[in-house]
Amino acid sequence: MSSLSDHTPMMQQYWKLKNQHPDQLMFYRMGDFYEIFYEDAKKAAKLLDITLTARGQSAGQSIPMCGIPFHSLEGYLAKLVKLGESVVICEQIGDPATSKGPVERQVVRIITPGTVSDEALLDERRDNLIAALLGDERLFGLAVLDITSGNFSVQEIKGWENLLAELERLNPVELLIPDDWPRDLPAEKRPGARRRAPWDFDRDSARKALCQQFATKDLKGFGCDKLTLAIGAAGCLLTYAKETQRTALPHLRSLRHERLDDTVILDGASRRNLELDINLAGGRDNTLQSVIDRCQTAMASRLLSRWLNRPLRDLKVLQARQDSIRCLLDSYRFEKLQPQLKEIGDIERILARIGLRNARPRDLARLRDALGALPELQNAMTELEAPHLARLAAITGTYPELASLLERAIIDNPPAVIRDGGVLKAGYDNELDELLAISENAGQFLIDLEAREKARTGLANLKVGYNRVHGYFIELPTKQAEQAPGDYIRRQTLKGAERFITPELKAFEDKALSAKSRALAREKMLYDALLETLISHLAPLQDSAAALAELDVLSNLAERALNLDLSCPRFVDEPCLRIEQGRHPVVEQVLTTPFVANDLGLDNSTRMLIITGPNMGGKSTYMRQTALIVLLAHIGSFVPAASCELSLVDRIFTRIGSSDDLAGGRSTFMVEMSETANILHNATDRSLVLMDEVGRGTSTFDGLSLAWAAAERLAQLRAYTLFATHYFELTVLPESEPLVANVHLNATEHNERIVFLHHVLPGPASQSYGLAVAQLAGVPTAVIQRAREHLGRLETTSLPHEQPAAHKAKDAPQVPHQSDLFASLPHPAIEKLGKLQLDDMTPRQAIEMLYQLKNLL
């Protein structure tokens, strides 16, 4: 870039501000537009699909530029934030009428994907998180902040594997890492990763900043005083939040210490495969949350999503939630609460915007309505006798003084912004009322003045008017201008008319225009004072919002329990997982036919089920429904089963389906083996493991060998395992592994068509039905027929499977009839020998053939 002195004064001002924010788009306010210059303009024009032009010159070069109207800002910001961009808003703060040189400007806010708070820029049903990381490959400190709610947490995590799984769960839109970290670390590959100066993570500075923020002497009260890495990360987050918001952050009131040991851990693959709140296509339809979320408020939907993605192992918390749901189901109490909860709205985010001092008039109107609904809701909550619900009721206040203040202050349907006034009610402030009266009565004054002047001058064509450039005026046609009285002072000459002003009109103009600007300034001052009053009550209001969000989630789970026919699971000390008539909560909602419920039993005598059966027979559904039932139990919800008895699990693993990881350079089989390795390294005797078609991505022998060894290892680990396979050889595992049992999904053929019955029955499947499924999928008949021929040849040429002696017992499971993948086909030498026509061979030919056969051995 050229020297700053080479630029025009305005562009010098621009570059002084832009140089402080080199990596962010700068929106530079000029009159009624935000202008964007130079490389920012080229980038913004492409991203926003707006016209790129050029204006004038500075430092001898034309200036690339584009612009947007100031009143359209939010729509463009929303698009940029969704694309992961950050924007610096630079406003005019000086008065153009009195400025000498460029109007004074300054940066008033910085919008980044992780620090936005504007309602229009957020997904109301999803947390908007920003995270920071500090540490090395052995131990990491992770801090996470939701600036739109004030939730602020820290934890320390061992190793990249656990860290990446936690980042997958949290899915922060921005991730801050130290600039002195090596390049291309796994964390930096995440979208939104940004490097920050190493001193932003300084642990001593962070500790002081956090203590100052929370007005405490130390961090012991938050249980994280010794988490030095996490404290450094939290300090970086706090600095970044203050830097972007340009204001104090009173809604950040505490720091929560999270522990992985308190939760049921799900890795990224398991989270995706179970489709908790995002389906495999990236949408939200047909996910677990889409079925069980009927929350009345957006803040409750976000809380439910956090519960689903972070199941708990705290039995006291889970049983308290179960008791609460039972209480809400009693006499259908939830039906009375839910309409009242709907009136509360998303006050969690409204309160955060109040804390950030950027709450809009409609935020205050919604808060007013919510506070007005609290007394009736509080009365209904006092009838709830469950201890946890009683605690929530005790936390929830009614705030009659604040409700009255907002009722007196805010009009029923306020405008979107305070900028143009019209937000505060008449009678709220006498001085404002007087100023507004002067401004609003201007129209009547002009009518009266015009009538008086017509009568005084006798000029019937006289008009009194106003425009923004010249102010108030009296207009006469050019032919009558010479008849104007002596006190008329010429103001403007037009084609066919002359405009004048009188001392009386000038005095009114000064008063009226002054009154309008003074009224806007007065209303803005009163509005800011109203925000400060609300900020002084922020702590109890935020506590009430959190309690109401939880009440909404519990009421929702009660409603779902009733309408989806869910039952309360029972936690026991004995290691087990017993489900009667379990169902898949999502699949049963989309089926047009009744869902076939199935039982499951795992305990100290059986820890693994080998599941066989045809494709489309229901193996994957059976496995997934088991995981979802266990997960729902661990958030305190009722579950889709006639009954469920289980012990606490520590992890849920799934190895179900795979696709190439093209970006990471990994094949389908490599992805499958990576997931399998993770399970074999980390599963315990308290883990639930789902393994579907392990080994299918490689050659038959390799795949079967790997599947067999993996199943043996899981049986030795005593993990609760559902192992679905088409390798029927694995059905002999119960002979060598006493904790393993066979089950199958049944099907039958009728008129050469397969019928899936979806019942889970003991023992292995009788056959694969692969050709029948292929026919059902529309594979051409000729191909199916040719496949039958190949199958017949393979089955007749394979050697019979050698069964262990134990398998010959009468009660042993019958191994299905299928070619043994470990049996050899006839040796090529034997095949060739069998085809020889010895009587037609000469002695020389016979000797040559003997050599050929020897070479085949």
UniProtKB/Swiss-Prot annotation:
One of the GO biological process terms: mismatch repair
Location of the region described as Disordered in the Swiss-Prot/TrEMBL record: 797-820
Record-linked PANTHER family: DNA MISMATCH REPAIR PROTEIN MSH1, MITOCHONDRIAL (PTHR11361:SF34), DNA MISMATCH REPAIR PROTEIN MUTS FAMILY MEMBER (PTHR11361)
Sites where the protein binds ATP: 613-620
Keyword presence, DNA damage: yes
Function in brief: This protein is involved in the repair of mismatches in DNA. It is possible that it carries out the mismatch recognition step. This protein has a weak ATPase activity.
Entry-linked InterPro entries: DNA_mismatch_repair_MutS (IPR005748), DNA_mismatch_repair_MutS-lik_N (IPR007695), DNA_mismatch_repair_MutS/MSH (IPR017261), DNA_mismatch_repair_MutS_C (IPR000432), DNA_mismatch_repair_MutS_clamp (IPR007861), DNA_mismatch_repair_MutS_core (IPR007696), DNA_mismatch_repair_MutS_N (IPR016151), DNA_mismatch_repair_MutS_sf (IPR036187)
PROSITE patterns reported for this sequence: DNA_MISMATCH_REPAIR_2
Record-linked Pfam families: MutS_I, MutS_II, MutS_III, MutS_IV, MutS_V
Example GO molecular function: ATP binding
UniProt record similarity statement: Belongs to the DNA mismatch repair MutS family.
Biological source species: Pseudomonas putida (strain ATCC 700007 / DSM 6899 / JCM 31910 / BCRC 17059 / LMG 24140 / F1)
SMART domains listed in its UniProt record: MUTSac, MUTSd
Name by which UniProt lists this protein: DNA mismatch repair protein MutS
GO cellular component terms, semicolon-separated: cytosol
Keywords: ATP-binding, DNA damage, DNA repair, DNA-binding, Nucleotide-binding
Keyword ATP-binding appears in the UniProt entry: yes
UniProt cross-references to NCBIfam families, sorted A to Z: mutS1, PRK05399.1
